[in-house]
């Protein structure tokens, strides 16, 4: 049996994953923008998680503008910069500096789970929406603090779950929003 059908299926799944991550992650955040066609100003906090390729390796669709990439590791940022052809001016080694200079509307956290709280602590007071990889936090204490910050500063705090990529999730989203399956939202 050749590996071609499996490879083709994996490529389709990867493509679906990338699309659905953005549909589900930024649907709400995008709806609060005054101009629905305006791309979201997106920054990345942390680069050690493998899902970073869903952002940096994704073909441009005009739905977001990558305005900054942060990680404390200079080796990792150099490798990622070279691999994805990132402009050096969007690379930062200080999260607060990046947030203040590039003013993203949303941040995706692709670093250590131990850094999720730090990212929310930096973003929430600035009114920046955050998506973290699963799990949300390393402890209930961190999770509660993140929830408090999100509520206090009225930001969206999302966790990226693999079910986001399931075809049934995309169909459900279509049924809810395009077909009015549950009424007007």
Predicted regions span which residues?
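Hydrophobic residues in well-ordered beta-strands that form the structural core
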Residues: 44, 132, 157-159
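Bacterial N-terminal signal peptides
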Residues: 19-29
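Beta-loop-alpha module in the N-terminal Rossmann-like domain of NAD(P)-dependent dehydrogenases
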Residues: 86-149
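A contiguous active-site-proximal alpha/beta segment in oxidoreductase catalytic domains
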Residues: 137-185
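N-terminal Rossmann-like dinucleotide-binding module
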Residues: 32-85
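Short, well-ordered coil/turn segments that N-cap beta-strands
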Residues: 64, 89, 128, 155-156
């Amino acid at each position: 049996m050749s590996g071609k059908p499996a490879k083709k299926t994996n490529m389709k799944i990867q493509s679906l994953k990338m699309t659905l991550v953005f549909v589900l992650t930024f649907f709400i955040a995008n709806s609060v923008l005054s101009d629905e066609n305006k791309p979201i100003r997106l920054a990345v906090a942390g680069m050690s998680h493998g899902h970073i390729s869903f952002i940096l390796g994704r073909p441009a669709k005009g739905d977001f503008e990558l305005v900054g990439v942060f990680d404390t590791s200079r080796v990792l940022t150099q490798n990622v910069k070279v691999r994805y052809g990132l402009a050096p001016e969007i690379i930062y080694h200080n999260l607060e500096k990046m947030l203040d200079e590039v003013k993203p509307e949303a941040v995706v956290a692709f670093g250590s789970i131990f850094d999720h709280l730090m990212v929310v602590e930096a973003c929430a007071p600035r009114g920046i929406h955050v998506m973290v990889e699963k799990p949300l936090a390393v402890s209930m204490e961190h999770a509660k603090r993140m929830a408090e910050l999100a509520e206090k500063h009225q930001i969206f705090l999302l966790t990226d779950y693999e079910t986001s990529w399931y075809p049934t999730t995309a169909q459900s989203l279509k049924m809810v929003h395009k077909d009015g399956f549950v009424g007007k939202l």
